[in-house]
């Protein structure tokens, strides 16, 4: 229904409402009566996909710099004390299509929490001295990823799947990228993208929508202007079939996957159920087969990544280097099984209940609700209520899962990344074949 220009929807006896402030953020809120906390999630629609040549790593650098100080909170310490001093928590994360800042505070401190979020986004200092010191911190972060075989394998898989463009490269960039970023380039990126009108703010707790909207208006003010779009995703897969990294480790890291669906694809919920059957959780097929039955891995799971115009399904595992061929064979067999056989009804029901139950449990936490409504408002074509999402999960049937698996799981689509000692990296491409 529409009331006063706002659209309201039920989410299991709860409501969310939207308001687009004039030349300011879009506000979406959900009232949770009796909640003792208020969570705020602010999505700046600026991620690494917006980086121009010569700016690689600037979105992540910008996120780091906001925590160095703002006009009202001039130091990292004053920012952290403002939130932690009342028992709250806060953080931020840069993705390829957005950067999210979140805070969770006791309800009486919600104005303080909103003020800090607004300061971080709209009024950061961006001093030269802070840029110099944070540059060194980010370089150490990059080195830590390269030294971690699991992280390094993910970096290799991204380039195998998405190529060397914005979706394939590491969000942090490489050392040379960070060394080459000038203070002016960082400030220009902030001016171009960190605008109130380029932000979605989700507020969840025991407060009315008008109250949430007022807090956002006070903290963010206004600031409009066109923000450039990002280049379209390449045709996937866009990189080499196999990427390898040599590391003298006692465990090999394996990532294997296929192109999947963009986030608003009509079959997105079918893909979520397929993934739950395949490798999401300890009762999934991969866990029971690769770990429990064959004893080939300690960690094995599957997951999804989705963007506005692209996506991928990935299986990752840590195995004995000598067992890489056997692990690949077992993983590929499970992909082929989904392609060739309908999922039994009892197993399908279990996977759907796993997804539905997990979603409902998360709705008791203000931070998860803020992520649910804020992430959808920022990144999707629509905001589903929880009931609507549950209905879409329930509507998935075995025939749809098998049909989708048949479309996704083909030999030409497979991409593989492995990090292991050099002698275990030979001959991998010939093993990258699904059973007939």
Please tell me what each predicted stretch does.
Residues 1-14:
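N-terminal amphipathic/basic-hydrophobic helices that include classical n-h-c signal peptides
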Residues 12, 16, 20, 31, ...:
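Charge-rich, well-structured scaffold segments of protease-associated domains
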Residues 34, 39-104, 280-296, 307:
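M16/MPP (pitrilysin/insulinase) zinc-metallopeptidase core fold and M16-derived inactive scaffolds
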Residues 39-43, 254-257, 416-417:
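Active-site-flanking beta-strand signature of metal-NTP-handling nucleotidyl enzymes
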Residues 240-250, 254-257, 266:
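Phosphate/diphosphate-binding glycine-rich loops and adjacent basic-rich segments that engage nucleotide
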Residues 271-280:
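A conserved active-site cap/scaffold subdomain adjacent to cofactor or substrate pockets
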